[in-house]
Amino acid sequence: MKIYSPLLIACFLISASPASSSGRVPIPDTPGKVFDLAWVGKMTRVSDPQIAPDGKSLVTVVTTPDYENDLNISELALVDISSGATRFITHGRKNAGFPRWSPSGDRVAFLAADGDKHNQIFVLDMAGGDAFQLTKSPTSIQQFAWKPDGSAFAYAAIDEAPKKTGADKFDDAFEVGNGSFLDKEKALPTHLWQVSAAGGEAKRLTSGTWTLPVAFPPGPPASPIAFTADGSKLVYVRLETTYSGDRRHSSPHVLDLATGRSEPITTHTMFASFPVPSPDGKHLAYVYPRDGSDRNYQDIFVVDGLKGDGRNITHVIDRNFFRALWTPDSKAIVTGGNDGATAGLWIQPVDGHATKLDLGDVTPNTGFWLDADVGPQGQIAFSGTEPHRPAEIYVLDSPGAKARRLTKFNADFDALTLGKSEVVTWKSPDKAPKNWTENGILTYPPNYAPGKKLPLVLYIHGGPTSSSKNAFSVFAQLIAAQGWLVFEPNYRGSDNFGNDYGRAIVDDSGDGPGRDVFAGIETLKKRGIVDEANIAVTGWSYGGYMTSWLIGHAQFWKAAIAGAPVTNLLDQYTLSDANVARATSIGGSPYTGDWMKHWVEQSPITYYQKMKTPTLVLQDVGDYRVTITQGYELYHALKDRGIQTQFYAYPIGGHSPADPVRIRDVYRRWIEWLDLYLPHS
């Protein structure tokens, strides 16, 4: 469903000043010796590694940009775990994803679009031949799972819209609930189906106004469905409504396939998700916030059997976890989360203490999800990066082994001169118990001369439940290649230290994090490497919030870039996809008690009169996560007062551009704006 007119051009410009650009940053025909926009076009993304049942190979999704057609081409590659030998197996199919091995290892099933552009299940015989389309769902299939004996699939698909005739076709009013203001209809529920692995007619397993979850990027994938070990039951997550703001009302359920009866697994009616039965059928792991409050980090809980709340087995680690992967012996889970200046993997026994795995300089991808798999002999495969290397697939041959790079999809980057990055630490400016040791990542320009003072560009991460890590960063390397220092500070609310650090942002959305960022800048100044007259602040999403907040609380900034900026928390509460779920981040609804003043005081737009920094605003028109109304508010707050500003909007849905051309355009405009205000080394 298209929300906006196709007559809109690729992006439109609202400018408060005449031709203020010195010209477009050129896109080289061939990549240079340092990281540039041409290198962005050469990057390959790898994700979703799945180890074969014999443990000898894995299949992974490989995604490359096609600028001529503005597409992300996703194919499946088979990789030998011993040698790294790689071959593509989907024979030119351009939209393959979600690969899953059959239990016997003779087939790989995956999702791809059919002629009607609906995702269907395709099955590929590993002995040879082309994949065949198994399903003919009238709507896109969201996910699937093999039955343990390989005889069938369970899958989740959105219900088909009811057919209307005559005047009823135009009767399209819908009841508004806790949804996004961009909704043009009430979302239909997603339900479970089963189909034979040989094909044929699918059987509906569930129905009703409730729904299985669907993905709302940026965020984790939908909570996976899973068969129990004996294949008699299905485990899934149930949401009580289809309204996006009600996603927190989630609870794990189990469906008996023989009787059709479904029951809740735990007593939790909110925040419980990602249930995974153990291979031996004796346990179930699921994700749930400690103490049942979504202000806290998520932990892994383990239930004996399929009934009960279980017990928290990861609270001692004190990190934020999104997923549990069972080891083959069912005695432990593998999990991961952000940790200090990197991300970590742990093996957590059902009973006993966790062991952190040795990953060296490799940072696993943990953005809302642990992109990993555990093999039949206990191998662990995951996607990750190193500070000077884009994403590849890495393997731990055993829990005690060191991570080794398995793939070389981005091998060309090995010869590139990149900026060195390092971890910077400082003490937060608050008194105990909030005088944390904090960190951030500093990236130098390539061939930096030690001690030389350079302009400083802040790139502040979003979330805020996320963190900047000493890993490969496209933004940091692109900006550093211009001759500037790049600083990616972590701040209270980040999830790289402990639960107390993460929840310290509650009812302190900007002031506390702002003090943390200022303290980090002061630490860099003391090194004598910062040109203090030339400091810029930038960020996307919550990074855009922090950018907007900081330009209203300090005037030393030379330039600012606010991508998808949260400027008005009232708009976030009333208009965004999460809407009412955001109340816990402040303490209560702005329309109850005396909470309104908290929401207003923590909104950057409240301090518009102090904003004096030349600012670039970037946003998608159909941004459901951070409404574009807030971009307009920031734009007018600056423009109407004579502050130099430009606002570029992309006429697409989503929280940020996902297509190659617009992604590159964001990078390009980022550099161009900074180039107007910062000198080069």
Please report, for each region that a protein language model flagged, where it lies by residue:
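Non-catalytic accessory segments flanking enzyme active sites
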Residues: 48-50, 154-156, 162-165, 185-192, ...
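Active-site-proximal cap/loop segments of hydrolase catalytic domains
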Residues: 434, 488-681
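Blade/loop signatures of beta-propeller domains
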Residues: 22-35, 70, 189-191
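Cap/lid segment of the alpha/beta-hydrolase catalytic domain
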Residues: 407-533, 540, 574-581
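A flexible loop/linker signature enriched in serine peptidases of the S9 family
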Residues: 62-75, 90-96, 106-122, 130, ...
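Short loop/turn segments that connect beta-strands within beta-propeller blades
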Residues: 80-84, 125-129, 196-200, 256-260, ...
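Blade-terminus and WD-like Trp-Asp/Gly-His loop motifs, strongest in beta-propeller folds
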Residues: 50-57, 98-107, 144-152, 225-233, ...
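Beta-strand-rich domains and repeat architectures in extracellular enzymes and scaffolds
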Residues: 38-74
